Amino acid sequence: MRKIIAEPLTKDAFAPFGDVIEAEEGTSFPINNGKTQRFHDLAKVEVGGENARVMVSIARGQPYDLPLTLNMVERHPLGSQAFMPLTSSPFLVIVCPDESGRPGVPRAFITKPGQGVNYARNTWHGVLTPIGEEQDFLIVDRGGEGNNLEEFFFPEPYEIHLPER
């Protein structure tokens, strides 16, 4: 089995795959008479296809055991897909570059508290992967007609590990 070590999630490292969603001072301004700080325009939501619309959902994910065996990735050709945790627990983010319509070698990231991700339209990615405990996530993605899911099963799985401490 091929081994992948998860790396810390950063905006620069994740940029080829989408957006890191997090509250940073450079992206905020006060609203509501100064009582609220708005962290603005943190991700590009993409929707395409017939009768496309933006959906907001909540998912409750069960934790995965580590190391994680990665057999499959998926992508959404008609829209982006964002996951924002509603807890402070970390989760794994797995993405692959596209290589002529197939996923390339995966990269794995581990989030820190307060980080979420927005997978850009057509980005190969792993499934929602909470670690440590059950977690709830706010999901922003595409609804509408048309097939918005493509799955790829690796002929040989990868094994995802957290970095050594």
Curated annotation (Swiss-Prot):
E.C. number(s) listed in UniProt: 4.3.2.3
A GO molecular-function annotation: ureidoglycolate hydrolase activity
Top-level lineage group: Bacteria
BP GO terms, sorted: allantoin catabolic process; purine nucleobase catabolic process
Cofactor(s) named in the record: Ni(2+)
The protein's annotated pathway: Nitrogen metabolism; (S)-allantoin degradation
Entry keyword set: Lyase, Purine metabolism
Presence of keyword Phosphoprotein: no
Catalytic reactions of this protein: (S)-ureidoglycolate = urea + glyoxylate
Enzyme class: lyase
Pfam families: Ureidogly_lyase (PF04115)
Alphabetical list of NCBIfam families matching this protein: PRK13395.1
Family matches, as PANTHER family: UREIDOGLYCOLATE HYDROLASE, UREIDOGLYCOLATE LYASE
Role noted for this protein: Catalyzes the catabolism of the allantoin degradation intermediate (S)-ureidoglycolate, generating urea and glyoxylate. Involved in the utilization of allantoin as nitrogen source.
Quaternary structure and partners: Homodimer.
Protein family per UniProt: Belongs to the ureidoglycolate lyase family.
Protein name: Ureidoglycolate lyase
The species this protein was found in: Chelativorans sp. (strain BNC1)
